Design a protein with these regions (language model features):
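Acidic donor-binding loop of glycosyltransferase active sites
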Residues: 31-46, 59
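Short hydrophobic beta-strand element within catalytic cores of glycosyltransferases
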Residues: 57-65
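Short alpha-helical donor nucleotide-sugar binding micro-motif in glycosyltransferases
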Residues: 20-21, 28-33
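Conserved acidic donor-binding segment of nucleotide-sugar-dependent glycosyltransferases
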Residues: 77-89, 97-104
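A short, well-ordered alpha-helix in the C-terminal region of glycosyltransferases
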Residues: 91, 98, 105-120, 126-132, ...
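Nucleotide-activated donor-binding/catalytic signature segment of Leloir-type glycosyltransferases, i.e.
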Residues: 3-21
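Short acidic/histidine- and often glycine-rich active-site loop of Leloir-type glycosyltransferases
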Residues: 65-83
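Short alpha-helical segment that forms part of, or immediately flanks, the ligand-binding pocket
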Residues: 27, 45, 49-56, 72-73, ...
Length: 143
């Protein structure tokens, strides 16, 4: 179905469906892109870990502000990228262009993405936050 859409929009050669990409290959793909776009409109998109993967490679992110999800929290608007209203293809395209076509904006969001990853999402930071949560819960149960 997606390939049919690509063909009908005359995008063959411009859009390629990759299928499954192994964890080992991911950094190469993120390295090859200019901007990472998470265009999901589904409320089931709770967090969008793919954003963190892209941010770990210093890639600016364009994502959607899905209500009641963590997607727009992960991608801090105007820090690590731009968040737009879900389902607004025009706003999504303009956000991608705003980053990809402006070197200063690209550099700022790229640096912001990597800094946000290092501040909040490294394995060590995530383990420390989980431990802090568990320690707090253990203290509550002992009282």
């Amino acid at each position: 179905k997606l390939q049919e859409e690509i063909n009908s929009m005359h995008l063959r050669g411009k859009v390629k469906l990759l299928g499954h990409v192994s964890d080992e290959e991911l950094p190469s793909y993120y390295g090859a892109c200019d901007v990472f776009c998470l265009s999901s409109v589904q409320k089931t998109e709770a967090f969008g870990i793919v954003q963190i993967e892209a941010m770990s490679c210093g890639k600016p992110v364009v994502a959607t502000k899905i209500p009641h999800s963590g997607v727009s929290w992960v991608n801090a608007h105007e820090e690590s990228g731009i968040n737009v209203v879900p389902g607004d293809a025009y706003a999504l395209a303009k956000a991608i262009e705003a980053i990809a076509e402006n070197g200063a904006a690209y550099d700022r969001y790229s640096e912001g993405a990597l800094n946000r990853y290092q501040k909040l999402f490294t394995k060590e930071k995530m383990i420390a936050k989980c431990k802090e949560l568990y320690d707090g819960l253990m203290k509550e149960t002992k009282q």
